[in-house]
Amino acid sequence: MKGGGFYQNQYLVPNVYFGNSSPVIAPIGGNALNNNNNNNNNNNNNGNNNNGININISNFQHQQHQIHQQHFGGLSPNMNQNHIIQHISHHQHQQAQQIQIIQNNNQPQPQQHQIQHQQQQQQQIQQQIQQQQIQQQQIQQQQIQQQQQQQIQQQQQQSKMNFIRGHHQRNSSFDEFSLSDVSVGSFKDMGWEEIYFCYHHFTQMDEGKGYLKSFQQLIRYITGLYPDISPSPNSQFLFSLGLLYPNALPQVQSPNMILSLTLKQMIETYSYTKSMVYSGSGSGGGNSGSGGGNSGSGGSSGNGTSGSGGSNNGSTIIINNTNLNNINNNNNTNNNNTNNINIPSTPPILRSLANGASSTNINIRKFSPQQACHIIDVFNSVKDNKTGGVSTLKLSLFGADASLLPLTTLPFHEFVQYIGLNIIPFENLFKPPPPPSSQLQSSPPIESQHLFLSEIDELTNNNQNNQNNNQQQQQYQQQQHHQQQQQQYQQQPQPQPQPQHQPFIYFEDTSNNNSPLDGNFNNSFGLFNNNNVVNHSPLGNNILNNIQQFNNQNNNQNNNNNNNNNNNNNNNNNNNNNNNNNNNNNNNNNHNNNNHNNNNNNNNQNNIFNHNQNQNNHLINNHSPNQYNNQGNILKNSGSVVEPPSQQQQYFSDIEISFSELKISSKLGEGTFGVVYKGLWRGSSVAIKQIKINEDVNNQVLEEFRKELTILSRLRHPNIVLLMAACTAPPNLCFITEYLPGGSLYDALHSKKIKMNMQLYKKLAIQIAQGMNYLHLSGVIHRDIKSLNLLLDEHMNVKICDFGLSKLKSKSTEMTKSIGSPIWMSPELLMGEDYTEKVDVYAFGIILWELGTGELPYSGLDSVQLALAVTTKSLRPPIPNAWPYQLSHLIQACWHQDPLKRPSFTEILNLLNEIP
């Protein structure tokens, strides 16, 4: 057994590898010696032999010593015990140090701890980033949903916009009916003055380009249309423009933005703005700022853009009724007083009607904005580019009565005025094929008025001018007479019956809410007889025949001119040479009662001027056989007085149609007065009410019925159902109204059970009161107001139907002595006593109660019990205590037992506005 085995196992240096399998000897003393010896072994011995021998001997001895150490486990056998103990303790100390080093290596270092902390922070940051990404995705999804909702809302708004644009088509049918929709504004009909001012101001602003290119031009255009309103309704006009034409104005608006606004857009926007500017009356009647208050050419009120002569220009443009403009001033010679009128929300013309002005008999036609554009288009297609007007001879193409027109060139304001007076039938207007260079907006000056104004002092040849005009007119009348005789001769031996004048009663009406003024001024056709005119719509299919007929007429006129050896041409030349003097004379003598030069004796009793044995170059236009004072319609360079129409034509020629024109599609309902059908008339959806009558209906009753229909057909109000036509030939006795798809208020309250709130309650109540107020001011008593006779349109607007027709109702097969429904009937009606318009006020009180409760009053009582309780015991429905005091007080006042103590609808409107 080899020595040193224990020590070899106990004193090995751990974790040390030297490349061989022999154990490592623990270091002992003499290491320095051994190292020196090793170093010495590597040295080259260059000394003497003796030194080399000694070195070799010492090395040999050292090798022997190492051999002995290896045999005894690294301990020299010559070492004593102390050396061994020291060696062991030293080795243990080294081993303890190595263990400490190993433990220190196993503990985490501070740098590693920081790295781990940073890694944890990075993980947290990554988690936060992931959460943020998730939130962003959720936000993006929400944004996508919001965008989709906005697109849906925009589509809904676009559909509403499309409805507003087509709002003028009153009889259009709609597939959907919503009780929550609310309409915004509507188109309003325009008078000839408004059409002229829209056209005139546009031509002053467009710089000959046919469109407004800047925002400054647009603002000046709006200001010119409303000279008497301060400040101008710019916001309402721009709002209407945005509704009708969303892309007309840039989204980012600035004073320097570039526009391209056409005359058609301006006219339609002006018509739509009327419903907002004059919202107080709910009618949007005439606009004094656009013709009503400016009777000069381009505004003699001082605010017009082209008028500079004040009241001296009155002969160029004469407003239909000067007194309507000067409400508080009887002096017709000073139109500048219109600026002193404070313009409230109600138009001045409507205020004059409410004040009892005698203008209810004036028959002035009004036009939709589309019709106005058609008039302008026709004018631009037939006018002379040199003079800017239309020759009177050209007007024969449109069936105009040449005897009522001056033998001069008509500027635009006279052209449109003659159309407004129906001297030039609007239905016969058509646009001839234009030359390639003509456009609707490319319009030279519409009147050469400056020629007359520049030579106002040249009045030397007035007598000669009048003689020339008289000769020219006589020759023209002879030509017309000769032409009529020739046509009558050609029609023999079987003379054709005279064509009945059946004008377009309802052409492209643009408003679901018409003006109350339309009842007095609108759609009054057939004022003048024209035996040789066949009326056609400008959009019809008979234009070629119409052109051919008038071409034949022109050929006859040319032949007559040749037979007269050019005398007519000579007279025309004289007239043209002296035209300025004639107009100057008219301008100076416009308001001078003693200096008028007349062509014909004035036989009109209603002339506002006192003409006696003088000759007149003005046309005194009185449309109705009824006498009225202070009414005049004077045109420039005219030479005759318009004869009033016959009584028969005045009463029903405009409203009566043939039953064969109607196409009945379905039955809507049936009542005691008649059966209501849905049908078609001239391409529009209408409601046809066929009347139940007895056999004892004689001609006198039918005549009264026709007269009553004529009055009712002229009623125009946004809350009145439009009466469009009627058939007055038994047994097919019926009348035609506009069709409202919303049904009756009765069905909405008691069948559909709509949810009523105060906002909707006030809206319905105010609209009913507005319609009834208009009827009463027009002299019409309804006598049968009830929820069944209140119809609704698509946007929950109320329209009153089944009014008037008292003569025919009394002959109904199932009507009793008392006309109406017992629930809504007043005590005086139930008792068969005399009654006034206050019977409608009583019924309105019952309707207010019905609106608030959604129920019918007097449940459990039959008609006899109800009549006795209402007349003898003053029975009324109970009013809930939770209702506002103002509303309760109003209802009690409306159904008061004494008719004299019931308020008028004018007072009712004021009280309704006070309800919170």
Curated annotation (Swiss-Prot):
Q: Where is the composition biased (Polar residues)?
A: 623-646
SMART domains recorded: S_TKc
Q: Which GO terms describe its molecular function?
A: ATP binding; protein kinase activity; protein serine kinase activity; protein serine/threonine kinase activity
Q: What protein name is recorded for this chain? A: Probable serine/threonine-protein kinase DDB_G0267514
Which EC number(s) are documented for this chain?
2.7.11.1
The record's section on PROSITE patterns has:
PROTEIN_KINASE_ATP, PROTEIN_KINASE_DOM, PROTEIN_KINASE_ST
Family, according to the entry, reads as follows: Belongs to the protein kinase superfamily. TKL Ser/Thr protein kinase family.
Which classification does the entry list for the species? Eukaryota, Amoebozoa, Evosea, Eumycetozoa, Dictyostelia
Gene Ontology cellular-component terms listed:
cytoplasm
Q: Which reaction does it catalyse?
A: L-seryl-[protein] + ATP = O-phospho-L-seryl-[protein] + ADP + H(+); L-threonyl-[protein] + ATP = O-phospho-L-threonyl-[protein] + ADP + H(+)
Locate the compositionally biased regions of type Low complexity: 461-493, 550-622
In terms of CDD domains, this protein maps to: STKc_MAP3K-like
InterPro entries linked: Kinase-like_dom_sf, Prot_kinase_dom, Protein_kinase_ATP_BS, Ser-Thr/Tyr_kinase_cat_dom, Ser/Thr_kinase_AS, Ser/Thr_Kinases-Pseudokinases
Which keywords, in A-to-Z order, does the entry hold? ATP-binding, Kinase, Nucleotide-binding, Serine/threonine-protein kinase, Transferase
- Residue ranges, annotated region (Disordered): 283-311, 461-518, 550-646
Q: Which amino acid positions bind ATP, per UniProt?
A: L668, G669, E670, G671, T672, F673, G674, V675, V676, K689
